[in-house]
């Protein structure tokens, strides 16, 4: 709009910084790929000061603090933090206000294996290092915000912790700031061969931290508390709530931590309830989805089974959804669902009814989901197996998972060189130094193997995550190799198709594509009549 353009023009004039270059795409890149938000801003609680990442000719070594005065333009203060880190190229992955004049900033080097936590003074621009983590491979959970005590003397964050031969798992660390020296001491509050997913709240009155974890199962999420003093006693607050149908939860606490909202997401029909923190057994059901539950009970839906496969010294989960009339005497096509990025998880206890459910019930297709090496929430050892060999080891696992099935189709999203650079470099390294790694992960070398296959490519023209050049390069090689393909374009849609009409069209396209090719290639064999005894 003209008004927004007017505001932007004023902002540009008031931020007087000779030589500073602003790039819209880089702003998105930092915001969504690193901070996991769409706008790279961090607001103080009273909404009067904003910390904002900027790009300079010397890489992202400047932070802009914008003071809002209720007018159309924003006078700004520029804080240069050179000298804080030992490397020239780094990312800011997290900014959190500690007080009106101090911010906590996490810096990540370009290879993403060195993370430095600093406290920066907004009035002087000076930053002091408080905590550093180094790794031989990339570091995950770098956009997570620490949870602070009210006086700022201690804060809690999720860090990788070694757990014997099983490797590292994410756990909660309490960092205490020494009053006189401002040095930080660290105490680990949790440990074990399971993952802390998210820190939800800190109650100073009871001195307890509340968090979600995979302690019971990597496929589930349970709400736990742990004491920050004494023997660090741990308690599960959700384990006894509707345990027959609820093992996967999310939760949110009230401002004073007296109550919490518990969202059961599966495996049964989702349920939302409010609980008293001091007595979780005292609760009120807000939504039980009774109509949905009754509808499902009336229908004969598909059966789901989870198998553990032993591959390369790992026990990896394979989830199979069978048609309602499945029998061992028939032959079925298998659709393997592949997620888009390392650290993702497909085999969970979440309630799931999606487009692929239609294929299972209507087209008698077995749908498989598999979490192989490179998947998340099973420890860092499994996750980091794809380091410098993405597109190789996880593909071997996927082939092993379906090798007993005669007919297989795949549905995946996106894997690298034309991908967002921070994402690609995290797993494959810097292109100029790791050209062989990028080449090894490319599908273009095996393009002739697709000659006899059916291929559907879907891309939104406004996709800023995987640029359209990615698909264009693939199509160019498909044409050269004489491979037939179908291309579906969605104008003005991003990486995730957003509008309802576009989503309906996308699902119809995918269902039609798989239904046609799977029926053609893997017809169900007629059942043989059983002999009377």
Question: At which residue positions do the language-model features occur?
Answer:
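Generic beta-strand/beta-sheet core signal
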Residues: 40, 106-108, 120, 132-133, ...
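Active/binding-pocket-proximal capping segment
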Residues: 110-111, 120-127, 132-136, 168-196, ...
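Conserved beta-strand positions that form and line the central face of beta-propeller blades
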Residues: 48, 61, 129-130, 185-189, ...
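Active-site-proximal cap/loop segments of hydrolase catalytic domains
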Residues: 369-533
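Cap/lid segment of the alpha/beta-hydrolase catalytic domain
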Residues: 135-136, 289-408
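Short, solvent-exposed loop/turn and secondary-structure capping segments
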Residues: 2-14, 115-118, 273-274, 330-331, ...
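Conserved hydrophobic/aromatic "anchor" residues
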Residues: 97, 148, 365, 490, ...
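Beta-propeller folds
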Residues: 1-253, 258-259, 265-270, 347-348, ...
């Amino acid at each position: 709009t003209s008004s927004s353009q007017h505001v932007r023009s004023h902002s540009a004039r008031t931020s007087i910084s000779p030589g500073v270059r602003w790039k819209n795409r880089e702003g998105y890149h930092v915001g969504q790929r690193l901070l996991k938000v769409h706008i790279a801003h961090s607001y103080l609680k009273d909404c009067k000061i904003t910390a904002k990442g900027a790009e300079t000719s010397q890489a992202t070594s400047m932070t802009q603090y914008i003071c809002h005065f209720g007018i159309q333009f924003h006078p700004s203060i520029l804080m240069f933090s050179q000298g804080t880190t030992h490397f020239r190229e780094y990312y800011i992955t997290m900014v959190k206000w500690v007080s009106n004049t101090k911010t906590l900033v996490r810096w990540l080097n370009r290879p993403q294996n060195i993370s430095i936590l600093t406290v920066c003074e907004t009035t002087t621009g000076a930053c002091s290092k408080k905590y550093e983590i180094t790794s031989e491979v990339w570091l995950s959970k770098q956009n997570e915000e620490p949870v602070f005590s009210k006086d700022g003397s201690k804060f809690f964050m999720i860090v990788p912790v070694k757990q014997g031969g099983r490797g590292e798992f994410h756990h909660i660390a309490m960092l205490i700031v020494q009053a006189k020296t401002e040095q930080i001491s660290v105490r680990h509050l949790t440990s074990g061969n399971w993952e802390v997913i998210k820190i939800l709240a800190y109650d100073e009155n009871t001195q307890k931290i509340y968090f979600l974890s995979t302690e019971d199962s990597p496929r589930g999420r349970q709400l736990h508390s742990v004491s920050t003093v004494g023997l660090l006693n741990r308690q599960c607050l959700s384990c006894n709530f509707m345990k027959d149908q609820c093992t996967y939860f999310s939760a949110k606490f009230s401002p004073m931590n007296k109550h919490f909202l518990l969202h059961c997401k599966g495996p049964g029909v989702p349920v939302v309830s409010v609980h008293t923190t001091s007595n979780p057994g005292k609760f009120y059901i807000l939504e039980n989805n009774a109509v949905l539950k009754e509808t499902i009970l009336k229908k004969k839906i598909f059966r789901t089974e989870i198998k553990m496969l032993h591959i390369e010294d790992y026990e990896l989960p394979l989830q199979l959804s069978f048609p309602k009339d499945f029998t061992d005497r028939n032959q079925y096509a298998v659709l393997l669902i592949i997620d888009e990025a390392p650290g993702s998880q497909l085999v969970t206890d979440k309630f799931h009814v999606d487009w692929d459910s239609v294929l299972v019930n209507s087209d008698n297709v077995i749908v498989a989901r598999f979490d192989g090496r490179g998947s998340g929430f099973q420890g860092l050892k499994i996750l980091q197996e794809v380091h410098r060999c993405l597109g190789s080891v996880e593909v071997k696992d996927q082939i092993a998972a379906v090798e007993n099935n005669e007919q297989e189709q795949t549905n995946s999203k996106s894997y690298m060189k034309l991908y967002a650079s921070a994402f690609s470099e995290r797993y494959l390294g810097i292109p100029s130094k790791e050209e062989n790694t990028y080449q090894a992960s490319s599908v273009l070398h095996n393009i002739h193997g697709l000659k006899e296959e059916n291929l559907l490519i879907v891309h939104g023209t406004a996709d800023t995550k995987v640029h359209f050049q990615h698909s264009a390069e693939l199509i160019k090689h498909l044409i050269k190799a004489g491979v037939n393909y179908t291309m579906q374009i969605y104008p003005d849609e991003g990486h995730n198709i957003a509008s309802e009409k576009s989503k309906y069209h996308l699902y119809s396209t995918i269902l039609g594509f798989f239904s046609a090719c799977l029926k053609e290639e893997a017809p169900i064999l007629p059942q043989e009549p059983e002999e009377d005894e």
